[in-house]
Structure formats: C-alpha cells, structure tokens
C-alpha cells in the first residue's frame, strides 16, 4: 500500500508540474494491466516521462537528495563486504548501486526510491540501514557497469552484443536484417537519447576507417561522444535510414528524410540528411523539440532597450524586414517569434519554408518542394493571389525570389525573409550584387536585423573577476561603462554545465532604413560606408551588443569574439 501511495503522489506531482500529460497518463493506465509493470516504470518505458523529470520529482516528493552519478570516477571505493551479497543482475534489474558506507549506513543510489521490494531486499542482504539518494536511471546503470560490472558504458555493453559484417553491406536484405537487430536499435536510440540529455541541436554520425564517429552540437559547439566500432557503420546508418523512410539501397546519392519519435517524454522531430563519403554515408540529424520551443523575444536574448525599435519596424503595414546571419544563427526562430507576435485574427499570414520547422496555429505554412517545381519563386506567385497581409519567405535565394518579394512589398504586403550575410549592412550589398535595382531597395526595405548566437554562462556558478587595464583598453569597455569598477566573468564547470555554459542567447545589430541610408544606397555606397552611416544613426553592432552582455555576466568576451570575428 505504501509503494502505491508513493507512486500516486509522484504521478500527481508530475501532472501538477506539467511534466506528464493527462492523455498520456490515461494511455499508460490502459496498457498497465496488459504489461504487468508498475505505472511509473511504464511511463518511463513509453517515453512519456523523461528520466530527469522522474528523478527530480521522486526526490522532491519523497524528500531525498538528487545526485549525479557521472561525478563519480571509474574506480569504486573499497568494496564493502556486505555488498558482495548483491548480484550484478539484481543491481541492474532494480537500477540501484551501493556507493559506500556512511555513519554505519549503506549509501544507496537508486532510480526508483518508491520500490519497497528492492529496498527491503538490499536491507536484508546487507544487514545495514540505508541512506537513500535518487539518480537518473541511465546514469546509475552506467555506474553499475563501471564499478561492479566489467567497466563498460551502456554503449559499450550494446556494442559487445551487436553483430556487424561489413562484407554483407551489398546484400540489401542482410543489411535490413542487421539494422533490425535489437542491439543496433538500442544503440541508435541511445545516441538520440544522449543528444536530448545534452540539449544538442544536431547529431553527427561520421564513418571513418577504424570507427564510426558520433558528435553532438551543444550550444553551437561540437562535442565528441562515445564511438561505436567501424564494423557497425552499415547497420547503424541503415537503421537511421529505415527510421527516416529513406532508400537503404541508395548509397551513392544524398538523401533527406524525417523521423518523428518520443524520447524522454518529448515529441521530437528529427530532420535527417545523408551524404556519401569515402568510408560510407555520413548522417546529420537536426533535433527540433516542438514542445519546449518558446517564441518570446526576451527569452531569445533581445533586450528591453532594443525591442521597442524592432517592434516599430516589424509592425509597419508594408515593406520588407530581413534577418541575416550564417546557418545556425537563430534566424528562423527569430522569424517565427515575429510571426507569433503579428498573428492576430484580423491578419492573414502565409509562409513558404524549406522545411516547415514549427507549426503555428492560425498561419498558413507552405512546404517548398523544388523537385516538383514548387520553389520559393513559384510559391510566391500563387501566394499573392491568396490575399495575405503578411508573407514570410524562408530565404531569398535568388534574384527571381527577391524581385517577387519586392513586388509584393510594393503592392501593400509586409514581407519577412532571411539572407546569409555576416552583418546588417551586408544585406543591402548582397541584394545589389544579386541584381536588385537600388531604387527598389530604397522603396521597400524597412530594416535588416543581423544576429549570432553566443553561449550563455551558467551565471550561478560563473567566476566574477575585475577586468584588467589591458582588457578595458583592448575592448574599449569604458565606452560601455564609463564609471565604476568593471567586472567580467569566466565559465566554471559543473555537473549540469560541464563547459560552464548553459544554453545560448542572441546578440544583434539592427539597421533601420532612413533617408541618409537611402541616398547612400542610390549612389552605390560600399558596405563599410553603409555601416558607418547606420552607426551614426544609432545602430549598435553585434560586437557591442555582445560586450554589453559580457559585462552583465550573460556570456564571455571570448564567446563574443568567437562568433563576431567575421562580422
């Protein structure tokens, strides 16, 4: 009865904290009778509750400490005599791990602290009172392997049981059989799960002669993960291609696909791209978390002193507003946030995207399909006959698309789009280089926003220090803070943020078109002159915006320099 009571309280807490949906709970209860599993175990198995949410809620409801098993080394403390009575199979089955003895009590780290059967069994086997602490299931399983097993990680255990035969890769049926083996399925699932735990935006799976390299892009920086051996290359790549509904027999041409799945309670949309390389197909999976994305300018890092000016340009009834920056700089998220602000019942919004990354209620979103002739330009021609107020084009890729967008702006539509340029002034010169007439640009461009993403400091643990005279002079910090002592921040590694950074924030510069800039465009002024005139009119560069954030402890000067050196 006590176990059920604890489970009930934990489930109720998960619902209250919105870490579990009512519909998912109903679904799990329907399956519970058939499976014979406990409710919380089933919720985890179905991916309806993430490991972290499960552990944090258990710790909070039961009043137990939450621990990070990754902080412990690979060598266990001196083995307790009493622990010898606990089999490795028992530890794995119940996801618990003794880590030492404290004040006559056995320090037991456990994933399911409501499991009275397992806890009583440990107490009886060891004859010791227990000190319970809660950890994530996968982290405790890894710890068990490292300490009480053969020192293998979860991936290492899977790899040992997996079969791979490079010589059979020309046989499509053999390849399909390899990809359908349970160890290969678990291996691919583990890679995706690890990406979710790391908050990665992309997974890179790259075949080489001796191994299959796995890397994750976390906060814009690639981090290498555990790599399976090269013998599993064909099986792993084929498994991903099967999940993405791609042709596993075609290995000479690039392919694009999509995987929809649920991982740790999150609905994930993975965009899959494959390209042939010397040692096999390289795969990149972009992770889109539809449930946690928030279209809020403040949460993106836009400052209160900047937003009024940006919104004023955004709310103009017609014209063109561009967002520029390299791939992965957050342009699409900024445009989606702008659209969500403009999305009211009295406005019709139509977008053309490749691909449609997030779906927004009330907005007509068109997926471009160049392979059947539905490119940006052709879609735009049809859109203007749909009586829209606002049009969003995923990217101005060519002169034809740019000219139709400009014509739409001239006929009373507000057009939002993106360009790949390094700074805001570069947006004007890029359109001129495309062949757009200068008088059309001056008549339609309202503003150009350039942006980058910098890693955000884990401010609670960052090291604050007084800036040296050399730093103050080199970065001209007195221009931003004329008075008082100037402080900067350094990242400090923690279990939650191994690099000292946690998430990313935006740094921006916003060029607002005015009469002086229009005259400069008409006389074909260079990018440098256009930027000088924009700064004279009040534009703050991305570099300056980044320095301001560094002074506030949001990021570091090193991060700002890393992303703005070409701006």
Curated annotation (Swiss-Prot):
GO terms for biological process: protein secretion by the type II secretion system. The keyword Glycosyltransferase does not apply. Transmembrane segments: none annotated. ATPase component of the type II secretion system required for the energy-dependent secretion of extracellular factors such as proteases and toxins from the periplasm. Acts as a molecular motor to provide the energy that is required for assembly of the pseudopilus and the extrusion of substrates generated in the cytoplasm. Keywords: ATP-binding, Cell inner membrane, Cell membrane, Membrane, Nucleotide-binding, Protein transport, Translocase, Transport. PANTHER family: COMG OPERON PROTEIN 1 (PTHR30258:SF2), TYPE II SECRETION SYSTEM PROTEIN GSPE-RELATED (PTHR30258). It is found in: Cell inner membrane. NCBIfam families: type_II_gspE (TIGR02533). This is Type II secretion system protein E. It comes from Xanthomonas campestris pv. campestris (strain ATCC 33913 / DSM 3586 / NCPPB 528 / LMG 568 / P 25). It comes from the Bacteria. Signal peptide: none annotated. The gene is xpsE.
């Amino acid at each position: 009865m006590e176990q059920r009571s604890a489970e009930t309280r934990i489930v109720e807490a998960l619902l209250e904290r919105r870490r579990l949906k009512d519909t998912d709970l109903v679904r799990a209860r329907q399956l519970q009778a058939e499976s014979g599993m406990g409710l919380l175990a089933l919720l985890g198995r179905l991916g309806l509750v993430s490991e972290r949410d499960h552990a944090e809620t258990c710790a909070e409801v039961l009043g137990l400490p939450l621990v990070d098993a990754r902080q412990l080394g690979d060598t266990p403390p001196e083995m307790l005599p009493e622990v010898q009575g606990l089999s490795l199979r028992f530890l794995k089955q119940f996801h618990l791990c003794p880590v030492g003895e404290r004040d006559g009590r056995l320090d037991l780290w456990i994933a399911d602290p409501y499991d009275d059967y397992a806890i009583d069994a440990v107490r009886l086997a060891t004859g010791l009172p227990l000190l319970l602490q809660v950890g994530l299931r996968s982290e405790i399983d890894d710890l068990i392997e490292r300490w009480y097993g053969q020192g293998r990680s979860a991936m290492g255990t899977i790899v040992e049981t997996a079969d791979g035969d490079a010589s059979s890769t020309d046989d499509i049926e053999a390849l399909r059989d390899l990809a359908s083996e349970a160890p290969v399925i678990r291996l691919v699932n583990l890679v995706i799960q690890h990406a979710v735990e790391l908050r990665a935006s992309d997974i890179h799976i790259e075949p080489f002669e001796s191994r299959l390299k796995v890397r994750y892009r976390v906060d814009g920086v690639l981090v290498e993960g555990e790599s399976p051996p090269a013998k599993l290359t064909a099986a792993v790549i084929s498994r991903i291609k099967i999940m993405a509904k791609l042709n596993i027999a075609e290995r000479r041409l690039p392919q694009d696909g999509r995987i929809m799945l649920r991982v740790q309670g999150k609905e994930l949309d993975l965009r899959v791209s494959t390209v042939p390389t010397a040692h096999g197909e390289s795969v990149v999976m972009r992770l889109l978390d539809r449930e946690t994305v928030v279209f809020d300018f403040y949460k993106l890092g836009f400052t209160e002193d900047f937003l009024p000016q940006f919104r004023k340009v955004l709310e103009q009834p017609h014209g063109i507003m561009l967002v520029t920056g390299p791939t992965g700089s957050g342009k699409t998220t900024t445009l989606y946030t702008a659209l969500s602000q403009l999305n009211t019942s009295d406005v019709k919004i139509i977008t053309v995207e490749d691909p449609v990354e997030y779906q927004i209620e009330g907005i007509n979103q068109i997926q471009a399909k160049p392979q059947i002739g539905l490119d940006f330009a052709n879609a735009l021609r049809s859109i203007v006959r749909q009586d829209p107020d606002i049009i969003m084009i995923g990217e101005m890729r060519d002169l034809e698309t740019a000219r139709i967008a400009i014509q739409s702006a001239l006929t009373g539509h507000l057009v939002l789009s993106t360009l790949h340029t390094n700074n805001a002034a570069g947006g004007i010169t890029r359109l001129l280089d495309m062949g757009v007439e200068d008088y059309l640009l001056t008549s339609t461009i309202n503003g150009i926003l350039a942006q980058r993403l910098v890693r955000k400091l884990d401010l609670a643990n960052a090291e604050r220090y007084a800036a040296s005279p050399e730093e103050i002079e080199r970065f001209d910090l007195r221009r931003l803070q004329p008075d008082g002592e100037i402080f900067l921040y350094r990242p400090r590694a923690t279990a939650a943020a191994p690099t000292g950074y946690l998430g990313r924030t935006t740094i921006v510069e916003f060029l607002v078109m005015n009469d002086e800039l229009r005259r400069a465009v008409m006389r074909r002024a260079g990018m440098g002159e256009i930027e000088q005139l924009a700064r004279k009119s009040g534009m703050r560069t991305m570099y300056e915006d980044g320095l301001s954030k560094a002074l506030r402890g949001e990021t570091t000067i090193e991060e700002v320099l890393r992303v703005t050196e070409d701006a």
